[in-house]
């Protein structure tokens, strides 16, 4: 199951958008895992207005062993697709294969990324207006599902090392399958990255122990029957069947929810209420629902058309599905809202609100002080030119006593002796750190290892 937190991180990343071909709603959440290793692409049109075709590109990348390869895919794979000759020739199945292979090539050419040991699954679709075609490329155990007349149709298949076709390639490349894992380690048999399993120079990309070459499935679109596409990582599919997910999307549409809200609620359904169960629901979670729009149809009209279909489903409510997924957990005393307590943000108490307001007041006073000069690039360059500046320490401007009093009064305790003379302030650690920083003594400054410059960008979302 991997390392997990004592409480899940429930902040959600959400994106939505629409054009004349597709509409989408994405939600992603770190959950119980120590870090977020998922990424995504959301491109309603990867061509320019001058091009004859209109092609949408969506993808989910589920990282393992780190987030770097997944992040690279989220940031770079659209550009890599646009570089492929096959893409500009309109050969979309070949374009996806070439894109996956060349992503591996570019990772190995990158001086930083070639030393990275992480990898990621990739499930993606191209939707072409002129070809009336949907193409899915998949490597790994993320999954893409098409809803057709309310029924789930698989557009991808999970690549597990126990599958006969996958195991034969692994063994032929001098690998082995042990405990249902590649070389006793990796729980999936296709991925981008994972170069420790692709080190045989005598073998092509499709022959390596772990290959990045995707399975391709083509589907000719029938807009009277084809409704939407769901792309999600295994954090979703470990909890729901493909049909479950299709039914939940239709349920959300009948309830008047947007695609964004539906994706968010599906994550709520799938997040484990505790880590004491089977381990499902404790993974990172990413899901995007892509609406397939008819010519001249907007997302509101599409939603109305979906509601009018009135498909029969076995799903009564989001809460009921959650109770069924986590049947080991006692929800008997929970109403339908309390069932989702683990992903519901708690309202702040008065102490927390007062503390944050006081800290914000001190910070604002410090930033507004005319004596406090921001460290701009020009300042840094000047310091680099002047060796004597390296030994100088920065100091903040005068302390705003009113703000200081607010900080102490809101966050600390004030005590006096029996004569009412001696005053003692008791500060929480966070308030003390803020006070010291305001006075020009940042407690973190003596620990340079805590000063990290981390890029938290986890995906790409762009509307043209």
Swiss-Prot record:
Region spans: Disordered: 361-398, 434-464
Annotated positions of the Phosphothreonine modification: 376, 380
Ranges of Polar residues composition bias in the record: 386-396
Record's subcellular location: Nucleus; Cytoplasm, Cytosol
Biased composition (Acidic residues): 366-384
Residues spanning the membrane: none
An MF annotation (GO) of this entry: metal ion binding
Alphabetized UniProt keyword annotations: Cytoplasm, Hydrolase, Magnesium, Manganese, Metal-binding, Nucleus, Phosphoprotein, Protein phosphatase
EC number: 3.1.3.16
The reaction(s) this protein catalyses: O-phospho-L-seryl-[protein] + H2O = L-seryl-[protein] + phosphate; O-phospho-L-threonyl-[protein] + H2O = L-threonyl-[protein] + phosphate
Presence of the UniProt keyword Transmembrane in the record: no
Bias (Basic and acidic residues) ranges: 448-458
SMART domains: PP2Cc
Superkingdom per UniProt: Eukaryota
Gene Ontology cellular component terms for the protein in this record: cytoplasm; cytosol; nucleus
Subunit organization: Interacts with IRE1 (when phosphorylated); the interaction is direct and serves to attenuate the endoplasmic reticulum unfolded protein response. Interacts (when phosphorylated) with RAD53 (via domain FHA 1); the interaction is direct and serves to regulate DNA damage checkpoint signaling. Interacts with the ATG17-ATG29-ATG31 and ATG1-ATG13 supercomplex; to regulate induction of autophagy.
Further details from the record: Present with 12600 molecules/cell in log phase SD medium.
Functional description taken from the UniProt entry: Dephosphorylating regulator for many key proteins. Dephosphorylates the cell cycle master regulator CDC28/cyclin-dependent kinase 1; its activity appears redundant with phosphatase PTC3. Dephosphorylates HOG1 at 'Thr-171', to attenuate activation of the stress-activated p38MAPK cascade; its activity appears redundant with phosphatase PTC3.
Protein name as it appears in the record: Protein phosphatase 2C homolog 2
Species for this entry: Saccharomyces cerevisiae (strain ATCC 204508 / S288c)
Lineage: Eukaryota, Fungi, Dikarya, Ascomycota, Saccharomycotina
């Amino acid at each position: 199951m991997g390392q997990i937190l004592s409480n899940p991180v429930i902040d959600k990343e959400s994106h939505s958008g629409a054009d004349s071909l597709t509409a989408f709603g994405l939600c992603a959440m770190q959950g119980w895992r120590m870090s977020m290793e998922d990424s995504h692409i959301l491109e309603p049109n990867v061509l320019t207005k001058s091009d004859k075709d209109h092609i949408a590109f969506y993808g989910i990348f589920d990282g393992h062993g780190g987030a770097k390869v997944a992040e690279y895919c989220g940031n770079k794979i659209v550009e890599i697709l646009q570089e492929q000759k096959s893409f500009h020739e309109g050969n979309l199945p070949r374009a996806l294969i070439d894109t996956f292979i060349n992503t591996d090539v570019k990772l190995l050419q990158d001086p930083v990324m070639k030393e990275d040991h992480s990898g990621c699954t990739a499930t993606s679709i191209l939707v072409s207006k002129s070809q009336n075609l949907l193409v899915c490329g998949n490597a790994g155990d993320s999954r893409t599902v098409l809803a057709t007349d309310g029924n789930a149709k698989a557009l991808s298949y999970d690549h597990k090392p126990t599958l006969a076709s996958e195991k034969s390639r692994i063994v032929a490349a001098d690998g082995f399958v042990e405990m249902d894992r590649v070389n006793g380690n990796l729980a999936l048999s296709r991925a981008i990255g994972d170069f420790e399993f692709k080190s045989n120079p005598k073998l092509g990309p499709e022959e390596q122990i772990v290959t990045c070459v995707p399975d391709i499935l083509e589907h000719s679109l029938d807009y009277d029957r084809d409704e939407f596409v769901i792309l999600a990582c295994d954090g979703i599919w470990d909890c729901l069947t493909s049909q479950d997910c299709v039914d939940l999307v239709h349920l959300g549409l009948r309830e008047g929810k947007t695609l964004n809200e539906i994706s968010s609620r599906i994550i709520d359904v799938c997040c484990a209420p505790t880590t004491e169960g089977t381990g499902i629901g404790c993974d990172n979670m990413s899901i995007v629902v892509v609406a397939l729009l008819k010519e001249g149809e907007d997302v509101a009209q599409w939603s109305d058309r979906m509601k009018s279909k009135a498909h029969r489903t076995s799903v009564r409510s989001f809460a009921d599905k959650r109770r069924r997924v986590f049947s080991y957990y006692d929800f008997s005393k929970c109403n339908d809202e309390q069932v989702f307590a683990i992903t519901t943000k708690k309202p702040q108490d008065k102490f927390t609100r007062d503390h944050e307001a006081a800290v914000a007041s001190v910070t604002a006073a410090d930033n507004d002080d005319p004596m406090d000069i921001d460290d701009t690039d020009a300042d840094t360059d000047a310091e680099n030119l002047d060796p004597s500046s390296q030994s100088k320490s920065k100091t903040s401007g005068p302390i705003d006593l009113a703000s200081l009093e607010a900080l102490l009064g809101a966050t600390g305790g004030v005590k006096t002796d029996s004569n009412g003379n001696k005053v003692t302030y008791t500060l929480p650690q966070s308030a003390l750190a803020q006070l010291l920083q305001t006075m020009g003594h940042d407690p973190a400054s003596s620990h340079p290892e805590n000063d990290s410059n981390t890029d938290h960008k986890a995906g790409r979302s762009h509307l043209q």
